[in-house]
């Protein structure tokens, strides 16, 4: 099972040399050793539509709705995929000449600063689109505290001086 976590920490610019450094290192070693890359998690895009609305799009071709699980717990969004019929398909085939399409189980966790509410999830043409909102609860918003100084306190202080 592959696993990837996401957080709203400041990220490096996409055009930066370091923006995709781990995937690039993984691909270099995979090419040198002939092994498959370690990062088998689905590719995804995360968009901020406005101040509170977000859209997450995952590329998961070959997965059906019943093989996917989307859950929210507090401020964490989890998307999991588990292929069900892969073993039966492999038994029907005598010998692979090349096997480049691999359906691994995956789990993606996205941690946000505040609780989120999923509004809609759609699966179309191998893309899972999840629309959600992330709002700061009123009790967690910063509040301005005003300081009142009554006139009597000012007068007493003037008399003492």
From Swiss-Prot:
Keyword Protein biosynthesis: no
SUPFAM superfamilies: HSP20-like chaperones
Domain sHSP: 35-150
Alphabetized Pfam families for the sequence: HSP20
Gene3D superfamilies (alphabetical): 2.60.40.790
UniProtKB keywords: Stress response
InterPro entries, sorted: A-crystallin/Hsp20_dom (IPR002068), ACD_IbpA/B (IPR037913), HSP20-like_chaperone (IPR008978)
PANTHER family tied to this protein: PTHR47062, SMALL HEAT SHOCK PROTEIN IBPA
Family: Belongs to the small heat shock protein (HSP20) family.
Protein's name in the database: Small heat shock protein ibp
Source organism (scientific name): Buchnera aphidicola subsp. Schizaphis graminum (strain Sg)
Lineage: Bacteria, Pseudomonadati, Pseudomonadota, Gammaproteobacteria, Enterobacterales
């Amino acid at each position: 099972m592959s696993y990837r976590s996401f957080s709203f920490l400041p990220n490096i610019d996409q055009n930066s040399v370091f923006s995709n450094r781990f995937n690039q290192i993984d691909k270099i070693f995979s090419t040198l050793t002939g092994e498959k890359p370690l990062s088998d998690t689905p590719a995804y895009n995360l968009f901020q539509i406005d101040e509170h609305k977000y859209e997450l799009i995952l590329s998961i071709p070959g997965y059906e709705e019943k093989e996917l699980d989307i859950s929210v717990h507090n401020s964490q969004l989890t998307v999991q995929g588990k292929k069900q019929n892969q073993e039966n398909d492999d038994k029907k085939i005598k010998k692979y000449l090349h096997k480049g399409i691999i359906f691994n189980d995956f789990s993606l966790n996205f941690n946000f600063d505040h609780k989120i509410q999923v509004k809609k999830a759609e699966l179309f043409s191998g893309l899972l689109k999840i629309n959600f909102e992330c709002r700061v609860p009123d009790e967690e918003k910063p509040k301005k505290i005003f300081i009142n100084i009554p006139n009597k306190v000012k007068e007493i202080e003037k008399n003492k001086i």
